[in-house]
């Protein structure tokens, strides 16, 4: 029920019409002719064509004004979705992708609190990407809503549960101490954070990998006679 404002003959009776249906009357200001009127009943969903007429004190009625076309949209957009499936990341500003009503404004929430960060869904496909401000290490529930051009807000999407971990594992330690060996495929024991993937190198060449359970054992491929500089990295 929008407020309609206009001007008419001073002191005249202004009638608001939606097509042929009357939506009420008001009196134009006796000096300025300015009037405001609120429809006496709610406008129907969709396109409405509003006009006004003015009737003077002796009953003469003007022709109708030019039409004001108003589209009423009280229907909220469909619930948007998040298509990103990443649950663990070392990116503190992960890019979130999904689908929302085409052309709608997508708003990002973290743990149910709006971030104020928005983006516009593609006008044809509804695809969107949105990125939060930098997140601290920890677990989060990310959701989005879609707002259409009429201001209707959708229900929140299903939550994406995501854990941010930007902390590198502790430095692995090679526990095996073999300065000299006759074994051309030596077994190397490495101490590393449980669950981390340990990669064994010799002069930059990968010799093998394994998953640590505090310790991990890696047997090298066949090595020729010579000196080797053995190192290890751990990736969580």
What label would you give each PLM region?
Residues 33-37, 126-130, 214-218:
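Short strand-edge motifs at loop-to-beta-strand transitions and within beta-strands
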Residues 39-47, 131-139, 219-229:
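Surface-exposed, short loops/turns at beta-strand junctions within beta-sandwich domains
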Residues 75-84, 167-176:
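Proline-enriched interdomain boundary motifs that mark the N-terminal boundary
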Residues 86-92, 178-184:
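Short, solvent-exposed loop/linker segments at the N-terminal edge
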Residues 2-4, 92-96, 184-188:
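Structural beta-strand segments of beta-rich domains
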Residues 56-62, 66-77, 90, 148, ...:
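Flexible, low-complexity linkers/stalks enriched in Thr/Pro that connect modular domains
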Residues 7-13, 99-105, 191-197:
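Short proline/glycine-enriched turn/loop motifs at strand-loop junctions of beta-rich domains
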């Amino acid at each position: 029920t929008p407020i309609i404002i206009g001007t008419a003959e001073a002191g005249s009776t202004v009638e608001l019409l939606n097509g042929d249906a009357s939506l009420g009357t008001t009196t134009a200001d006796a000096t300025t002719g300015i009037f405001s009127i609120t429809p006496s009943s709610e406008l129907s969903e969709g396109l409405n064509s509003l006009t006004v007429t003015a009737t003077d004190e002796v009953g003469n009625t003007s022709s109708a004004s030019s039409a004001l076309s108003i589209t009423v949209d009280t229907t909220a957009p469909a619930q948007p979705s998040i298509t990103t499936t990443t649950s663990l990341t070392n990116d503190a500003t992960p890019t979130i992708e999904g689908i929302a009503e085409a052309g709608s404004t997508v708003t990002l929430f973290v743990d149910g609190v709006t971030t104020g960060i928005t983006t516009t869904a593609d006008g044809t496909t509804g695809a969107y990407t949105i990125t939060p401000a930098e997140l601290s290490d920890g677990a989060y529930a990310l959701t989005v809503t879609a707002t259409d051009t009429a201001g209707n807000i959708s229900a929140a999407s299903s939550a994406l549960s995501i854990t941010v971990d930007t902390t590198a594992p502790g430095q692995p330690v090679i526990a095996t101490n073999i300065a000299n060996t006759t074994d051309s495929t030596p077994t190397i024991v490495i101490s590393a954070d449980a669950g981390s993937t340990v990669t064994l190198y010799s002069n930059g060449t990968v010799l093998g990998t394994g998953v640590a359970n505090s310790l991990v054992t890696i047997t090298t491929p066949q090595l020729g006679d010579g000196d080797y500089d053995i190192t290890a990295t751990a990736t969580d």
